[in-house]
């Protein structure tokens, strides 16, 4: 069953009098429980497509349906509520707040919910345990390695039990060993916890961990050869 259904999506920006076509008729289906790698050169539109899937932007044309909801027809307020419930984001640069402990960083998405403090703490502790950092809950980002910081970032992304996990170059700022550990974790989230994952990467080594790979180049999408 498809969780993500993207049909004939176009996206363009304007710079002065110039029109820049970033996505040109992209269509893509992602199955429930799939781990998809999205590859392509710099400037190919990978992050733009990921942002559209996460409801951070809207297409110029075409349709985007995720978990039965049409994102392209939603207003800004609707999108924000939908995004908070259904999407977990993992970024290349972690984006942790340095003045908060690992646990408090993981709790941040839950501040937008009606959950009380004790329940937020409990869910953050569970997420940190899943990523193997239960013993680092009280540590600040400066006390963690880069790989550990990214694990906290992943815990923050899964703390609200999202429908879809979107990862933008999650190993791009890590050395090979730490990057492999993050890829191991993403595979485990997909395999053991049933998380549907779309991962943007330029690294073929990282893409090998996914169950399927697609390539985006000059705004058009092609399936990788089996």
What are these language model-derived features?
Residues 218-226:
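Conserved switch/coupling elements of ABC/ABC-like ATPase nucleotide-binding domains
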Residues 2-217:
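ABC family nucleotide-binding domain
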């Amino acid at each position: 069953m498809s969780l993500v259904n993207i049909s004939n999506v176009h996206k363009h920006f304007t710079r002065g009098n110039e029109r820049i076509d970033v996505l040109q008729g992209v269509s893509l289906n992602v199955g429930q429980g799939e781990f998809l790698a999205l590859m392509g050169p710099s400037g190919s539109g990978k992050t733009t497509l990921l942002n559209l899937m996460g409801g951070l932007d809207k297409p110029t044309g075409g349709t985007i349906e995720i978990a039965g909801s049409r994102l392209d027809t939603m207003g800004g307020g609707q999108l924000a509520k939908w995004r908070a419930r259904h999407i977990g984001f993992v970024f290349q640069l972690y984006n942790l707040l340095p003045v908060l402990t690992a646990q408090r960083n993981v709790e941040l998405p839950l501040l937008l919910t009606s959950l009380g403090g004790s329940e937020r703490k409990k869910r953050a502790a569970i997420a940190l345990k899943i990523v193997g950092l239960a013993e680092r809950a009280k540590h600040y980002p400066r006390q963690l390695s880069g790989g550990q910081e990214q694990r906290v970032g992943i815990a923050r992304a899964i703390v609200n039990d999202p429908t879809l996990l979107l990862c933008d170059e999650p190993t791009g700022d890590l050395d090979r060993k730490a990057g492999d550990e993050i890829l191991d974790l993403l595979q485990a989230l997909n395999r053991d916890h049933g998380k549907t994952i779309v991962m943007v990467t330029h690294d073929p080594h990282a893409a090998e961990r996914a169950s399927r790979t697609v390539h985006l180049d000059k705004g058009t999408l092609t399936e990788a050869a089996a």
